[in-house]
Amino acid sequence: MNKFSKNISVAHSPDADDIFMYAAIAFGWASDERLKLSAKADDIESLNLSCLKGVYDVCAISFGLYPHIFSDYALLDTATSFGRGYGPKLIVKKNAVLKRNFKVALSGKHTSNALLFSIAYPDARAVYMNFLEIEKAVLSGQVDAGVLIHESILDFSDELRVERELWDIWCELAGTEKLPLPLGGMAMGQS
């Protein structure tokens, strides 16, 4: 009897919901002798860069990246992230007044929040870092502002305030509040 064997790599964000969704793969509960699934959690910009190199078979991506990879990856109908009335937040120190060319920390060049942010603030100077470091960078004065994503939008320092919701930028660009803000999804290699 011929045994078919296939290894499939799946990469996702370290968000609590993603960790939960992919736990069966991470613990080996979804694999058998015909199909071996492996899971890896990484920050979204690392995942985006991995897709540009074709590293994973299935990978979480920012929708801002998709125009760069659509010929190599197909979007899946599952595990997508949209915001409605909420989403990434531009944060600053409580008493900050932003200048036109302020320095901002973003979670990556190819992220959806970076794309949306660059449309709204074309003169801002972007610095890219892991999303877990953004709050600290604003508090320390390393940057003037930062865009928070994931769970960090729910619980950040009292020394900071929300300057602007990226949801509001999206609504202004879309001309309506009826369209959800596209953030990210899962893409599968077409090979």
Predicted regions and their residues:
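N-terminal hydrophobic or amphipathic helices and topogenic motifs
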Residues: M1-S81
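Bilobed "Venus flytrap"/periplasmic-binding protein-like clamshell domains
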Residues: N2-G28, Y86-D144, I149-L154
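Structural signal for conserved beta-strand scaffold positions within catalytic alpha/beta enzyme cores
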Residues: H12, A41, D77, L106, ...
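Short glycine-enriched loop/turn motifs at secondary-structure junctions
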Residues: E33, Y121, L179-P182
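Short C-terminal domain-edge/linker segments immediately following a structured domain
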Residues: A41-D43, F70, K89-K93, I134-V138, ...
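Acidic, polar ligand-binding/catalytic clefts
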Residues: V58-K89, N95-A96, E151-R164
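Hydrophobic/proline-rich hinge and linker segments of small-molecule sensing/allosteric domains
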Residues: L75-L98, D168-Q190
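Pocket-lining segment of extracytoplasmic ligand-binding domains
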Residues: L132-S191
